[in-house]
């Protein structure tokens, strides 16, 4: 039922470079992908060290690109932090990436609400709760959600 994995044809360094040529990866993510391809732990470490030395692998660059990508999708700060934590990016790197990619989270929450609800104010408490849940899922704080939803009635 299960096939035994064959030995990889590429060296671990070549495989790492091939993965990084398509898109940026985090250190942990690259480690996992190489392990899934069947490389030995020592080969994986050598490939990662090679990529770090030649600046092919950079967690800060990866985190900044993830922040930009999630902001474009309309996600809030909490969601972005959670995603980066799941990908095991160091907290200090996340802080630095967030500082280097400054955003107005209140305005982004407002834009996300306008896009989803087309500027229509909630008619009742049930509808308001639905809008709040949507923005919470997107990763916005309650202050940002309050700003986004109360701002609509002023237009």
Curated annotation (Swiss-Prot):
Origin superkingdom: Bacteria
Can you say where in the cell this protein is located?
Answer: Cytoplasm
Q: Which GO terms describe its cellular component?
A: cytoplasm
Listed Pfam families: RecX_HTH1, RecX_HTH2, RecX_HTH3
Checking Gene3D superfamilies in the record gives: Winged helix-like DNA-binding domain superfamily/Winged helix DNA-binding domain
Q: Name one GO biological process term.
A: regulation of DNA repair
Chief location:
cytoplasm
Q: Which UniProt keywords apply?
A: Cytoplasm
Q: What does this protein do?
A: Modulates RecA activity.
- Homology family: Belongs to the RecX family.
Quote the protein name from its UniProt record: Regulatory protein RecX
């Amino acid at each position: 039922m299960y096939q035994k994995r064959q030995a990889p044809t590429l060296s671990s360094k070549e495989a790492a470079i091939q993965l990084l040529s398509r898109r940026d990866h985090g250190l942990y993510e690259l480690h996992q992908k190489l392990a899934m391809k069947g490389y030995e732990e020592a080969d994986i470490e050598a490939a990662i060290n090679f990529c770090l030395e030649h600046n092919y692998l950079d967690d800060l660059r990866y985190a900044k690109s993830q922040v930009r990508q999630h902001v474009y999708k309309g996600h809030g700060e909490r969601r972005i932090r959670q995603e980066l934590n799941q990908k095991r990016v160091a907290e200090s790197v996340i802080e630095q990436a967030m500082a280097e990619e400054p955003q107005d989270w209140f305005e982004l929450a407002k834009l996300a609400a306008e896009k989803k609800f087309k500027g229509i104010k909630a008619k009742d408490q049930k509808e308001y709760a639905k809008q709040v849940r949507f923005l919470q899922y997107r990763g916005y704080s309650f202050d940002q959600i309050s700003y986004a939803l109360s701002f609509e009635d002023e237009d």
